[in-house]
Amino acid sequence: MARMHSRDRGKSGSTRPPRVAPPSWVEYSPEEVESLVVDLAKQGYEPAMIGIKLRDEYGIPDVKLITGKKITEILEEHGLAPELPEDLLNLIRRAKRVREHLKRHPKDLHSKRGLQLIESKIHRLVKYYKRKGVLPEDWKYDPEALHVE
């Protein structure tokens, strides 16, 4: 399938092997993994970065296989879940960066078009998250009012 806003077909990549049980070489118990996730979240890491750190530094390939819960589910249980979903937050940050670029370079039409595409993705995601009940129905994307770091 093609990419959303271009005709590119993407690139091939390896797929993760389907596993039912955690690998035998993982030496962490579910409780230890859960506490690691909570500790990393308290240090300020986002869910995707927590997964990468656990994979690269602790040798934990898949949190869900070991604990039976996703990283965001663990964070929700401990009251550490981000208020906005991570993919939406990343798109909002990207739009903010492009908007700041356009303040300095107002004639950059390619970036203006890029901002339109990013904001289209934001609106599409907001609609999805409202439908799923993740965001409240009255939540609205307002680039000036939203303050994300």
Swiss-Prot record:
GO terms for biological process: translation. PROSITE patterns: RIBOSOMAL_S15. The keyword Aminoacyl-tRNA synthetase does not apply. GO terms for molecular function: small ribosomal subunit rRNA binding; structural constituent of ribosome. Keywords: Ribonucleoprotein, Ribosomal protein. Part of the 30S ribosomal subunit. This is Small ribosomal subunit protein uS15. It comes from Methanopyrus kandleri (strain AV19 / DSM 6324 / JCM 9639 / NBRC 100938).
